Amino acid sequence: MEARPPKGPGKQFTFDYENEVHKRDYFIKSPPPQLFFSGTSWKKRLFILSQSRGTGLSLSYYKDHQHRGSIEIDGSSTVEVGINCQEKMQSVQKMFKCHPDEVMSIRTANRDYFLIGHDREKIKDWVSFMTPYCQGVKATHQRAEEKLSLGDRRPVSDPSPFLGLCSIPEGIRLASPRASLPEHLIQKSLQRFRQAHLHQDHDFHSEPTQDTEEEYYLTPRSLEACLELENIAGPNDSGDSIESNSPDQGFKRAESNYVSMRSLRTCLLKESTSASADDNDGQAEFQTESELGPPHQDSGTGSDPCLSPPNSKAQTTDDQKGSASLTVVKLSILLNNIPDESQVETLNVFLSPRDAIDYLALVEAAGQICVARWEGPPRLGCLFYHGDHILAVNDLKPQSLEEVSLFLTRCIQKEKVKLSIGRIPNSEKLHASPCACSLRHQLAESVQRDLPELERTPKRSPAIKKSQKEAAGE
């Protein structure tokens, strides 16, 4: 049963429990996952750990006199000190200036919670108290099963004298599910394995055990990699434009058989926005998350835009060069070579939140949040230039890519969002793939070609006159 705080006012208040109360203390609680990187969303709460009706624990938290929620800790939960995700841990340290040992992670079936304290010993004490309730009888049986399974597969590291060598071939099949190694290699490895086992009748934890074990497992792994590369580089790769004499042919072909997670997410987002997008947007591959390095380009109109092309040198026209993503190195060079910061122009770009989320890709470079790629439809045009960096989103200055995403998500219901852009003078325009600028340029060139020579001469005369005047002035 949850705590029932009193209704009357007062500085001191007590809680009535039917179950036993084990611990109570104040912690800073993490917000929902979508607001994790927002420091103002973390709140200080009073936590009370009590016995639940079952075999687990109930961790209730309160704001002043009000019960705000509870965390059920049972056999399916995990409690540990610190945060496994390095990115999240670094963000928490930056926001709260705390040590990793002052953070407690609680993972349940529905959500992950992170609690920040200011006493390492207190955090360790809480984790030590809750851990047995997370493991319970289920974890005991699981450890026993894992021990038996480990004994069947790896008899070298198990000092049990009852384990024989008859189960070794089965263990090899378990550790190597592909079963693509030749039989003579397996027998050779088994022979070395038996010889090492005979020298370790009384000392099972000596250093030779680790060396033999490492050699036994690493050898099949490297051979399997070679066999897989030979199978991948077979005749099935039709349409691959890489020459057969290329030394990295097998690596490139192996890489082309996989779909990157970024491209897969791009496809899912395209399907969800295809109802409101133009027909030409189907061939454009846009970025939703900033990542280091250039993205994959479409190799042709008949290929799947979600697959990485095997040859990135195809179709290197000027328009495709303009539509490619700007790398972190190129953006850093542009920003570091600005002669005067006062020359950077500040302007506002108004977009719908959905267009900004779907078609705009950002990346961090030289301490700025820069525009790396723009894949908007032709109706929007080419709005950005090389080196454009985000100064504010609806007059809110973001400090990271996560805050930009958070600001855009919060105004998703609004009609327009204002992006304050810093623009480098005389920078090159960043074209999109379905860009209309290239069509206008081609049309102007064709009209210029069709005109007679006499009609084209006056258009070039101003430049000629300018050069003559300069020559006369010299």
UniProtKB/Swiss-Prot annotation:
Residues 232-251, 272-321, 449-474 are annotated as: Disordered. Transmembrane segments: none annotated. Residues 449-458 have a biased composition (Basic and acidic residues). It comes from the Eukaryota. Residues 238-248 have a biased composition (Polar residues). Residues 20-135 form the PH domain. Disulfide bonds: none annotated. InterPro entries: PH-like_dom_sf, PH_domain, PLEKHS1. Coiled coil: none annotated. This is Pleckstrin homology domain-containing family S member 1. It comes from Mus musculus. The lineage of its organism: Eukaryota, Metazoa, Chordata, Craniata, Vertebrata.
